[in-house]
């Protein structure tokens, strides 16, 4: 049986997508605690009262997804594998159970994501970069649906000098370069991504400036 998985879901305004994702998670036996992190008080107040196994927390509006992820880690704890999911992702049956099994069975994998393409894979694929909106089989780790193994979750926090971008790149390089683990796309677990619904319909203020600043900081840190 797969190890239990805690789940962190940042959200702002895609309540339909969030409800669909929660429905997917409700039938996955590996899922333990789910934390919904609301981007601002208005979002928090709009969310329905949580059911069993679901908690909701709030961060000041616009502080960035890295602070949202860290707030979620604080809420669910660091004792289990942690999945970080966007609210515009749909998971196929037992997706997180499959990812958890992969982490349990291969101690060299530090971070893993489902196959998010329409291309069938016969084996897990090691990756050295991130998805980058490439859904044709050439993309890497999916920041919109990634799971960090428990022993790394115990010591990792997202870099809050970044705001909205490059967090998946940052954790990928930490896992592979700093800690010496592998990053993998799992061939048996699958998901579908609606490609940044919130960014397209309700983007952060100063979108271009924030992207540029995150890019400059990330490159100075790693490249």
Predicted regions and their residues:
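Conserved donor NDP-sugar-binding/catalytic core segment of glycosyltransferases
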Residues: 94-126
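A short, conserved alpha-helix in the catalytic core of glycosyltransferases
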Residues: 140, 145-146, 151-152, 156, ...
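Glycine-rich, basic loop-to-helix element that forms the pyrophosphate-binding segment
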Residues: 60-76
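Active-site donor/metal-binding and catalytic loop motifs
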Residues: 184-205
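Short beta-strand-to-loop acidic/aromatic patch adjacent to the donor-nucleotide binding site
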Residues: 79-90
